[in-house]
Amino acid sequence: MAEAEEKRVGVGEARAPLAVEALRGKIVEKVKGNRVTLIVGDTGCGKSSMVPQFLLEENMEPILCTQPRRFAVVAIAQMIAESRNCQVGEEVGYHIGHSNVSNLNSKRSRIVFKTAGVVLEQMRDKGIAALNYKVIILDEIHERSVESDLVLACVKQFMMKKNDLRLILMSATADITRYKDYFRDLGRGERVEVIAIPSSPRSSIFQRKVLYLEQIVDILKMDSESLSTKYCSGPNTAADAGLKPDVYELIHRLLLHIHQNEPDIGKSILVFLPTYYALEQQWIRLLSASSMFKVHILHRSIDTDEALQTMKVSKSCRKVILATNIAESSVTIPGVAYVIDSCRSLQVYWDPIRKTDSAELVWVSKSQAEQRKGRTGRTCDGQIYRLVTGPFYNSLTDHEYPAILRLSLREQVLMICCAESRAMNDPHVLLQKVLDPPDSDVVEDALESLVQIRALDKPTSPRGRHEPTFYGCLLNSLPLSFDASVLALKFGDTGSICEGILISIMLDIQPLPIVQPFGHQQLCKMYRNNYFEEEGIDLQTGKKEAALVGNLCAFQFWQRMFKDKYRLDCLINVVNTHEPKASNGFVAKPEDEWCAFHNLVPTALNYISEIYDDIMGTLHRFRPSFLVKINPPMYLQPSEFHHMCLRHEVLELENVNSLPLEAENSHLDSHRRCAATPYVSPADFGTTTVVKTLKTLIKEMKTQSAADRVTYRELVHGYVQPALENEMCVFFLNGSCNRGDTCHFSHSSRAPRPICKFFLTLQGCRNGNSCSFSHDSGSLVSSSITSGICSQENRATSVCCKRLLPAAGDGHILVMNDKSLQFACKLCNYYDPTKIIACTPGPHSFESDSVTKGLKILQNLADPSYLFIGGEHKLSVPWTKLSRVFWFADIDSNESISEQVVLQKFFQHIAIKTLSEKMSDLQVIVIMNNAKFVQLQVERLARECFLFLGESFMFDEATLGWFSDTPNYPRGMQVSAPVAYIFSMHPPTGIQFGDYASELRKVLYSN
């Protein structure tokens, strides 16, 4: 009777008061009075969203909040911003990866949400200064990622020095005793205050009911024999966690049962599955019920904006959310009344045999299962279906195994060694202070591995520490995973840094540029083949490699076709209006339509562009030697690349009976595709060269990682001398060789086995030691062990004058922005003064004898457009004879913003002049401090005007003039010095965009 009398709140009605709101005063009081506060409350009590606001309203700000997943960071920040009637990025902001949406409008955000990884990077670079907050909230502390554990340890270390810092730990399922013990040594008299948030009064709480396999099969009227064997492969967690077809079928029947028996169509169903493949398999089974459900997918490969669509309540069709553990914690999905929990998850671990990270399906912990349970009963009553028996559930571990005990820790050890603060730069010390310290042998193995690849130097004394090398510092500073960073720098040493960065980014991110229609594998392959079909080149590639190259070609196609067209339009607009227009400010709709027409994801393309610029900025700060000579992007070849779109309706394959899918298949709505396939042929964009380089570098990386278990037979002149005996016959190995003694290969069991072709790919061989083929890299070139270790540019080898000036005195030189004329006058010592024209941004008073005779001076040209357009009839510049244009950027620190605008104008107008007059041989040289070069995003500004960086080297101040610009002292092994950057024009293809030169000339001279 009591249950019947309880208040029920339906979907769409006003929410009941959150349990945490009743403890507002106590929470604020305890946080003010204690340095560490542990808040424990059931999922859905309002901890994540309300506690930061309680503190903000008491002026305890700024506040830093961490969340384990990007999706949660964005969703909670948006929710709080909406509730406080402000825009995200103002009072409430967030920072995930390369997206920093905080501190907008020149004001610091008062609440900032970040992932643990972002906080860790900031502490590495800034030390205690990264914790310039009054309160730090570490949410969902039960999720034991390596980053979360390290953030906790580092914050604890810095709290020893920062007494005014307040730390709040929050979770629904954390082991309270462990965390209280962990902070026991924080200081004398310190205590960890624990606040337990009780359930709301029974009159307002939503009810949750948990059912196990025994009850589920009874409800569905299914056979109840051997449930654990049929659905769990065994009676306890020792059983294989793989998903059998029976499990998918059970979920399908359960979905239909819920739909048929739940009259409120607004009540949604959330299904937890461990992998993308499992999500697809379940989705395929739902095709027959396409009229009943609107399906959403939550997976890391789904764009964040698309994933947030799951937060919208559906009133026209029942919403089914198929999700991995991305939906496990922090975020409330409105209207979820049912949770189906497969009780499996995907766990990453270090495979010492394959020398790579591997993944396996495992059973969840009780803590994880409780988190999944908490996804319902938050905005309505809920039922939870756990696809294990009751006794099986009782055998689950209480908490998940910490990731820090499962991984190799190479990346983390390198990060610690590169940290600026002494409080966290010793891996042996810091890693012993985490909640679950890894074995010291694991740390030592990671250090030895990093020494082997020359990322660290060995200690010079028994008590010394491992110091990072230049290569190690650069590896650690790139915003990429460890292996992706290694690959990018190896590409740099081959002269293909542009392609290397793009491929490395695509190793790390999801979604990728090419649309992957969910549940349509053949369609996915067809879309990829439109950009790269490996059958078109005589090179065998692995599955991952083919996907990477295909997406690289797609990105390059977008650059050549869509972006180049937009860049041209921007330049024409500049001539018409005499105002600069930012090339990244285009209207989203035309790009969305163009991308849909070519099966591309616009958000992924633009995200990759942002990361690319970030990585290039890091390289320019460190100045590795390969920046001295940079090959232009391969997508510029052939120069006359052409693609003519052909409109057609979607193919039969795309018109299959499909489920309304809100995330990935929204691109199918337009029903129009470009039929001019393939969009990119194997001959375009240097694809064959890229594939060869990628395969070679992956082999090097595999050899390098396996070097500690390679025994070389003989080392001769920098390569490994193979064994004299012939390689073992592959057919003999399989027991099928019928050539006997006439076989050219060995039939001896001692003969070297052929190298496994999968071992030398990104994915690696899954068979490990049981593989019939060899994983011994001793037969490979040993130079790969030490090649690709990039070094810093040698400042002592400056040959500045020879590289800056035209050969044999051929051509005129235009020097712009030379405030004191010192650079132009110095150039006159090495070049004919009568062929040099110097421009000053303002009026210049000078003694006649201080200026070289014959040097032509143009004054008051602060706006470069006057020289190229407005004042052309007055200012005589021999444009057709120009060979070099210099921009001498000796910038004061307070001029940065205005200088960026002026530089943008300079690049735009030099591009307009160059393209209209077809002066493609003209070189544009910017001389600027490298730190300012990065800060002002000069390379991006130039690239948006078809000017690509080809060379860069240290500027010889002693010979050509001293810089007054002295930025802050650089961090670590970064450089801060004037550098000469040489740009060359790579015009867009005339075949594709018509006679744009004539159009530019017409507009230019009509003004």
Swiss-Prot record:
Helicase ATP-binding domain location: 28-192
Residue ranges of the motif DEAH box: 139-142
Molecular functions per Gene Ontology: ATP binding; ATP hydrolysis activity; DNA binding; helicase activity; mRNA binding; RNA binding; zinc ion binding
Ranges where the Helicase C-terminal domain occurs: 250-420
Residues holding ATP: 41-48
PANTHER family, A to Z: ATP-DEPENDENT RNA HELICASE, ATP-DEPENDENT RNA HELICASE DHX34-RELATED
Official protein name in the record: Zinc finger CCCH domain-containing protein 4
Organism per entry: Oryza sativa subsp. japonica
